[in-house]
Amino acid sequence: MLENLCTLPLSADLFAQALHPEKPLLTVGLSSGHVHTFSLPPAKKDGKGLIKEIWSTRRHKGSCRCLVYGHDGKALYSAGTDCIVKHFDPETGKVKSKINIPKRGNHDDPPAIMHALTPKTLLLGTDSGALYILDLLKDGSLSPEPVRKHMPHDDYVTSITPLPPSAESTSGFSKQWVSTGGSTLAVTDVRSGIMARSEDQEDELLCSAIIPSGLGPKKMRGNAVVAVGTGSGVLTMWDRGSWDDQQERIYVAGGRGKKEPESLDCIVRVPASHGSGTKVAVGVGDGSVCIVDLRRREVELTLRHDEVEGVTAIGFDCYDRMISGGGKVVKVWAEADSPEEAESEDDDEDGSSKKRQRDDDDDSDDSDSDDDSSEDEKPAKSNSKRRKGKGPLPGTIAFPGLD
């Protein structure tokens, strides 16, 4: 069972969220164009710790729509409605390189999605439906111009999910990916281009995640399966290699008598440490997070991120804690202690309290003061992300009930 450890308030609506692959770092991009990076507390048994802001800046004029870490976590990339892609240091926020997004004719073509496919390849999708392939240099810097351009869908790309590399792969990195956009799913190869495109699903396909093995058809359990979230609240299942049409449907937030279907806006595979490795966490338009067991084809657990705003981003950090984002809030979730563990911790705390009273020492804890501050700037006018709508940010946020 997952429980909410803490809630991190934001100064503007969340448009993008990225998690460092190896360190407890969370970076958020806001509707105001600001980008903030926070250090999450380590996963200690006592649960004590602080969320600390490492740096913040107004990275883009307009909104920051996309954020992604490089494969090794040494580079961070952002893209905004100013039609600029920036590469910067995750620890300091210092910009190292930047490029302009190609125009669509004489008009700007703002970003819709970004994904680091390999250490040498960055994928960038735009509002016009273009999908650009960008080369990355040895230090993670951006190449001046895209090396390829594809149009896999009639609308903008809503999700990108790499397919597992083949057994013949020498690099160990994927060269193919599944994308969704409009009402279709497509498969693209970094060299060969668009390889497959599904039939019209007559429903908006919004997000996707892959289960590498364990869910394929009989006698092919090792075959990968892609789960796709839709605008009607239904999760569709696709077998690798059978890209014409979906194979199964799971009703998560719509269908089968549900009054108001809610969109499934984001999805992530739940780590095997939380179960069988065949579950996904889905962010829903009504502000809930659903844990879906794909093997049993059912919703296992529903959590509440927000009462009003939908969940627009979801992921797991390096300690397998779930991070959900939406509206002006980010929440951190972790496995709840079992009753036996909780009772044991209470006993330990009682004993420690009595010992402190006996010792009567006068030691004091040193506290770090963060004097970093961002410039006072008026927030930019909110820009809609993907054609839909939005006091200073505190430097440290404590877990509820803890020092």
From Swiss-Prot:
Q: State the GO CC annotations.
A: nucleolus
Region Disordered: what ranges? 335-403
Q: Does the keyword Repeat apply?
A: yes
In terms of SUPFAM superfamilies, this protein maps to:
WD40 repeat-like
Q: Does the keyword Protein biosynthesis apply?
A: no
Task: Kindly give the SMART domains that the UniProt entry links to this protein.
Answer: WD40
| Keyword line | Nucleus, Repeat, WD repeat
**Taxonomic superkingdom:** Eukaryota
Q: Where are the WD repeats?
A: 9-48, 59-98, 105-144, 200-248, 306-343
Q: Where in the cell is it found?
A: Nucleus, Nucleolus
Name the residue ranges with Acidic residues bias: 337-350, 360-375
Q: Which family does it belong to?
A: Belongs to the WD repeat WDR55 family.
Protein name as catalogued: WD repeat-containing protein JIP5
Identify the species of origin. Pyricularia oryzae (strain 70-15 / ATCC MYA-4617 / FGSC 8958)
Q: What is the lineage of its organism?
A: Eukaryota, Fungi, Dikarya, Ascomycota, Pezizomycotina
* Gene label: JIP5
